[in-house]
UniProtKB/Swiss-Prot annotation:
<dbReference type="InterPro" id="IPR023065">
    <property type="entry name" value="Uncharacterised_ApaG"/>
</dbReference>
<dbReference type="Pfam" id="PF04379">
    <property type="entry name" value="DUF525"/>
</dbReference>
<feature type="domain" description="ApaG">
    <location>
        <begin position="1"/>
        <end position="125"/>
    </location>
</feature>
<dbReference type="GO" id="GO:0070987">
    <property type="term" value="P:error-free translesion synthesis"/>
</dbReference>
<dbReference type="InterPro" id="IPR007474">
    <property type="entry name" value="ApaG_domain"/>
</dbReference>
<dbReference type="InterPro" id="IPR036767">
    <property type="entry name" value="ApaG_sf"/>
</dbReference>
<protein>
    <recommendedName>
        <fullName>Protein ApaG</fullName>
    </recommendedName>
</protein>
């Protein structure tokens, strides 16, 4: 039986007020993702898929190779961290998705990116 790689994904998001224009329905958010390899062998992140949903229910799908122009190799016990951004038409939304990855044998697998909230500070209680 092949052991599934153990990967932990954590995301922290912030509202970028200086780049947002609420009166034009432009709300900018930055998010920092940490991908930790908790397994015993190397893994490589090859691609990503995002489902972005605003508070009106409008969904946008984004997919592509790597993240921020990289396809990082993550050694056991190490992590890869990056920051990216999203622009919504509403002050509240969510993002979720998965990473396409391969293990040290070249076997493909997916790692879930748990849903996280994008919200301006006034909406967070």
């Amino acid at each position: 039986m092949i052991e599934q790689p153990r990967i932990c994904v954590q995301v922290h998001s912030i509202y970028v007020e200086t780049q947002s224009i609420p009166e034009e329905e432009r709300f900018v958010f930055a998010y920092t993702v940490t991908v930790r390899n908790l397994g015993r062998s190397n893994v490589q992140l090859l691609g990503r898929y995002w489902l972005i949903t605003n508070s009106n229910g409008r969904q946008t799908e984004v997919q592509g190779e790597g993240v921020i122009g990289e396809q990082p190799l993550i050694l056991p016990g190490n992590e890869f961290q990056y920051t990216s951004g999203a622009v919504l038409e509403t002050p509240l939304g969510t993002m979720e998705g998965h990473y396409e990855m391969i293990d040290h044998l070249g076997q493909a697998f997916r790692t879930v990116i748990p849903v996280f909230r994008l919200a301006i500070p006034a909406l967070i209680h």
